[in-house]
Amino acid sequence: MTSQRSLSSPQTRRPSVMGLISLVGSIVLLFLLIFRASTWACLFCFTTYEERLRVCQLFVGREETKINLCRNELEGAFEDLKDMKINYDERSYLHDEFTQMTVSLQEKAARRREPFWLAFKDAAAKLKRTIEHLKKAPACIPPCGLQEVARLFHCSGCFSKLCDLPLDCPVQDMLVNRGDQALFSCIVAFELPESEITYSWKFVGGVRTKDVTYFRDMPGAHGYLARIRPVQPKHGGTFSCVILHDQRPLARLYFYLNVTGPPPPEDTELQVTFREVMNRTPAEPEMIQPWSPSLGELLTNPQALTLGNLFLLAATAALGSASVTLLVWLFFRWYLSGN
């Protein structure tokens, strides 16, 4: 048997090589387009495709080649604004500035007094100065918290981002003697919104943890301060304070309370008696009733013959004598009138 070996000529290999080069070139071009769009994206974040196209049409007409050249010049003029990060609260103001820039370029195109590349360069320089004078966002303050005031808008991808910090703060250890006072302050170093701030307190006894599943609510605590007085061993454990803005958590603080100190000495018998007297419920007070002695009690009880009682006895005797005299006189008068 004879074996045949097929040999490929350079002409047959050339199409496959050319196809590979074309594929690599397409991929490189795609990466360049993506990189370019992400590099000068401030222009793309605050203007629309239709707005940019309209500007170039007013400058160069509707010929596609000239429009592509104009668009490249417009995008290239904003190269200095690559990777810009601005205060998120200034985003609306910057959008208005880009809108005003677009209107200004359209007016320049209508007057046809300067070439488009010069107009684009001047517009980009003005916007760069505007961005540099925007109010800066405060820096992130570690170690924790959802810090809205530090939110930044990234032109590189037209998105906003918060500080890369956890919501949970580190546990603060507190060593308090038995019988003393424990004071917890739910305060963070970063700026909080001015309104709709609430505080929620939770507690888990006996452990040092940040696992929220173990905690139970403390309905009696609502403000940013919490106090325990006097501290007892049952208060040992982890206290958690959640700062909320419109029911959205901004930070969770943890306080581990370690109660130390010996138990109080046993009370003496005198201290026990004194505490019982102090805690005893007062009895009903006795009402003093006035005493009005009778005539027999005045005569039989020598202690009752006070000055007032003697006067009362004399008055009674005089009244009795006068009554008897009057009765005798009335009787004699009746008797004599009958005779």
From Swiss-Prot:
Any one biological process term the GO annotation gives: sperm-egg recognition
Looking at the UniProt entry, the stretches that span the membrane are 311-331
User: Mostly located where?
Assistant: membrane
Per the similarity annotation, which family is this?
A: Belongs to the SPACA6 family.
Query: What does the UniProt entry state concerning the protein's domains?
Result: The extracellular domain shows strong structural similarity with IZUMO1 but does not interact with the IZUMO1 receptor IZUMO1R/JUNO.
What quaternary structure, including any partners, is listed in this protein's UniProt entry? Forms a complex with IZUMO1 and TMEM81 on spermatocyte cell membrane required for fertilization.
Q: What is this protein called?
A: Sperm acrosome membrane-associated protein 6
